[in-house]
Amino acid sequence: MGQPIAIEVRNVSKRYSDDPGLAPALDNVSVNIADNEFFTLLGPSGCGKTTLLRAIAGFEHVSDGEIRLAGETVNHLPPFKRRVNTVFQSYALFPHMSVAQNIAFGLEMQGLDRKTIPGRVDEMLALVQMEHLAGRKPAQLSGGQQQRVALARALAPKPKVLLLDEPLSALDLKLRKEMQVELKRVQQEAGITFIFVTHDQEEALTLSDRIAVMSAGKILQIGTPIDIYERPQHRFVAQFIGDINFLPGQLKRGEHNENIFVPNGMPVEIPCPPQGVNGSSVQLAFRPERSQLVAADQPHHLRGVIEAVLYVGTATLYQCRLNNDIKVMLRENNEGLNRGRAVGEPVAVHLPPQACLLMEA
């Protein structure tokens, strides 16, 4: 990355017990996060993402390793001395205070000149587009409005980094999508680093400049949303980010020294990317939307039968049982030219080479 580094996490581990039989909450985690970056920690419950966020904030002491903020080691510093603020899932607004008073509270605790506080509050109200609601109490606000107030309050003291612990999870789907757009806008306008924790894959792909996918206390892969979705380096990452199918089989060399995948139990040869070793057992992975359903009499394709049809509005999902008894999920966009397909219908599946990923068996 060409930008200056905002946060450095170096070989950080966190253990809650000295019992060697218990896995650590964080296991030798390292990552650099740039200034002004929207960086997401993504993973299932219990993967360590919130523990890492809390360690950066200073709410958790690390067992090993180092956390640096703008080049300074902060392991020994309490949270209030780290120039890092946190937005929690619960928002934690003061119910007896107005919107403006909630935003001003952190500035008052910081000892800011009282003459400058109203101007800073006005800036934050404008940033989150809530000038007209400055006098309301939290109970008079919607969930999305409360989230904006919590965001404004956290940004008001001008932290170096803002940490967000699943702040959208309590909102309904429509409001959550609206707030995703708002959150990205606020981050770009505020011009500071956001570190965002979520288990929602779509949320991570939508918001992030880069994503770290975590499992069992480890970071498995760091990359842009396109890298993570299109080029997963681990089976867990491939399965956790979106839907994906796996076919076991063998690699061999074609006539022109290209890679050819032969699925187990099927006399089909599928051109695939230049990965792997000739003769090695591998898994061919492909996304449902990257495959193409074609007529069953087409040669050189996977063959199978449709077992289930799921209409999802803009697309239809087809669960197919291939002739080697492997089940795969396929997706077709619902366009005017598409004809409906029925359960029991024989089909063939075309996999373009660019749709194929090779992974270890």
Swiss-Prot record:
Residues 7-241 form the ABC transporter domain. ATP binds at G43, P44, S45, G46, C47, G48, K49, T50. Its EC number is 7.6.2.11. It catalyses: ATP + H2O + polyamine-[polyamine-binding protein]Side 1 = ADP + phosphate + polyamineSide 2 + [polyamine-binding protein]Side 1. The keyword Membrane applies. It is a peripheral membrane protein. The keyword S-adenosyl-L-methionine does not apply. GO terms for cellular component: ATP-binding cassette (ABC) transporter complex. GO terms for molecular function: ABC-type putrescine transporter activity; ATP binding; ATP hydrolysis activity. It is found in: Cell inner membrane. InterPro entries: AAA+_ATPase, ABC_SmlMolc_Importer, ABC_transporter-like_ATP-bd, ABC_transporter-like_CS, Mo/tungstate-bd_C_term_dom, P-loop_NTPase, PotA-like, PotA_ATP-bd. Keywords: ATP-binding, Cell inner membrane, Cell membrane, Membrane, Nucleotide-binding, Translocase, Transport. PROSITE patterns: ABC_TRANSPORTER_1 (PS00211), ABC_TRANSPORTER_2 (PS50893), POTA (PS51305). Belongs to the ABC transporter superfamily. Spermidine/putrescine importer (TC 3.A.1.11.1) family. The complex is composed of two ATP-binding proteins (PotA), two transmembrane proteins (PotB and PotC) and a solute-binding protein (PotD). Part of the ABC transporter complex PotABCD involved in spermidine/putrescine import. Responsible for energy coupling to the transport system. This is Spermidine/putrescine import ATP-binding protein PotA. It comes from Pseudomonas fluorescens (strain Pf0-1).
